[in-house]
Structure formats: structure tokens, C-alpha cells
Amino acid sequence: MALKQVSSSKCFGGLQKVFEHDSVELKCKMKFAVYLPPKAETGKCPVLYWLSGLTCTEQNFISKSGYHQAASEHGLVVIAPDTSPRGCNIKGEEDSWDFGTGAGFYVDATEDLWKTNYRMYSYVTKELPQLVNDNFPVDPQRMSVFGHSMGGHGALICALKNPGKYKSVSAFAPLCNPVLCRWGKKAFTGYLGTDQSKWEAYDATYLVKSYPGPQLDILIDQGKEDEFLSDGQLLPDNFIAACTEKKIPVVFRLQEGYDHSYYFIATFIADHIRHHAKYLNA
């Protein structure tokens, strides 16, 4: 599958690149970002996938989070895909910021209008990793995932639905229990229909209750001043309770004074990369 390089910039001794390709799963052109650390010049590196939140493209993380120095030092290839298919001309796709374009929610849609293109779960867990493994110096056996908000939800479900595939998982302000929040209800109804039992297959709080192992150490940072926390969109307490019940280790850090923004992510990104490097470089 042909990759077209869109951009390449040197950063902390490595290269921040963006590529475009024709996606089989999403049936449209997709862009994704890839950071190749200096170590990638001489051998295969572990790979860390970042999943972004609502309204984002592949650009937000690479331009705002300041992750490059830590990724360079730890020798990690970092992949950041877009958050939805683009330009599919589906009725209603552009109507709201929390559904359709920029809001794929990392599910495989089953509703007629969306099921042909909106297959972000299969894209980020199957098609994109295959593409990355085939085209870049990565070790497919050493892979981890993290994300923010809707992408934090994505990271958690990808890890929980694929035991052993990802060495570690972390999230910033994730939607932990989307079947119970407004964003989740809207997205799941649109993409998956009204049968709520189908929704549970993409809800971290439900998935963790039936997670069979191997052990997964989960790191979550949450800003205490996050408007979406107080608004009931994120519901981390429900997820932590489910983890505790299942004896799955989760480090949850409520960060005083921080909000939902990339300033919050930039503050703690090095901690998260260190968390993943511990497992990826073991």
C-alpha cells in the first residue's frame, strides 16, 4: 500500500514526518504522523500509538504536546493517526463537533449510514499497525498505546479488547464510561444503534470487568479543574472501582489546578513516555 510523505522535520535528532495513504478500512485518504527517533537509523524500535481527542487531526499532538524529547531519549517510534475518516460526504458528518468528522470514537460502526467508513477501531488496531510494521523500523512485538479524552477512551479499549497486544497503556482525561455520558450516548447511538449491549463492547469500565489478562499496568492523569470532569463526561471513578474489583493495577493521578487542554498534556507527557518505555524497553 503506497505511502505518500507529506512533510518531514528534524526534531531532537530524529524526524517528525506526516504521511498520507488510501485506507482500506475507512475507504478514504488518511494522514498519520510518525516520529522516528535517532535510534531508528540503526535498528528496530518499539512503537507507541497516540490517539487524539474530539476535533483533532494528526497535527494536534505533534505540534502541542512537546513529546519529542522524551521519545528521542527513550528511542520510541511514535504514531499519531487522525481521529476519523475525512471527506466521505455522509449526511450529517459535518453537523456537530462531537459526532462524525473529528469524532470517530475508535469504534467500528454498524449503522447503515456510517458502517462503510467509520471503522476507526479496526483502522487503529489492525490496518495502521500493519502499515507501520511494513514501512518503518519498528518491532511489532513491542507496541503500546496512549491517548487523550476520546483518544484516552480509545487507548483503554484497544488495550482491554486485545490482551497482550499492547505492552502498556496510559491516558490523559479519558472518557472512562462512555455508555453513561452524553458524548458517549450520542456517538454510540449514531454509530452502533440503540441496543446498549453493543455499546458495552467499546466501554472501558465494562471491558475491564471481563479482562482476562495478562497484567496491564494502567496510568491515568486527570486535571482536577477539567470542565468535562465536573460535567460528568469522563467518569473515572467508575473505571477505578471496576479495576479495583478486578485487582487490575491502575495509577490514577488527580492533578491539582490542571484543565483538559494540551497544556496539561505537555506537563505530564514525559511521565507517560517513561511509563511506556519501562515496558517497551524491558
Curated annotation (Swiss-Prot):
Modified residues (N-acetylalanine): A2
Gene3D superfamilies reported for this sequence: alpha/beta hydrolase (3.40.50.1820)
Keywords, comma-separated and alphabetical: Acetylation, Cytoplasm, Cytoplasmic vesicle, Hydrolase, Serine esterase
Gene Ontology BP terms: formaldehyde catabolic process
Places the protein is found: Cytoplasm; Cytoplasmic vesicle
Residues the record lists as N6-succinyllysine modifications: K4
SUPFAM superfamilies: alpha/beta-Hydrolases
The keyword Cytoplasm is annotated on this UniProt entry: yes
One Gene Ontology term, aspect cellular component: cytosol
GO MF terms held by the record: carboxylic ester hydrolase activity; S-formylglutathione hydrolase activity
Keyword Cytoplasm: yes
Enzyme class, first EC level, given as a word: hydrolase
Domain of life of the native organism: Eukaryota
E.C. designation(s): 3.1.2.12
Active site positions, chain numbering: S149, D226, H260
UniProt catalytic activity: S-formylglutathione + H2O = formate + glutathione + H(+)
Subunit organization: Homodimer.
Family, similarity comment: Belongs to the esterase D family.
Its biological purpose: Serine hydrolase involved in the detoxification of formaldehyde.
Protein name: S-formylglutathione hydrolase
Native species: Bos taurus
Gene assigned in the entry: ESD
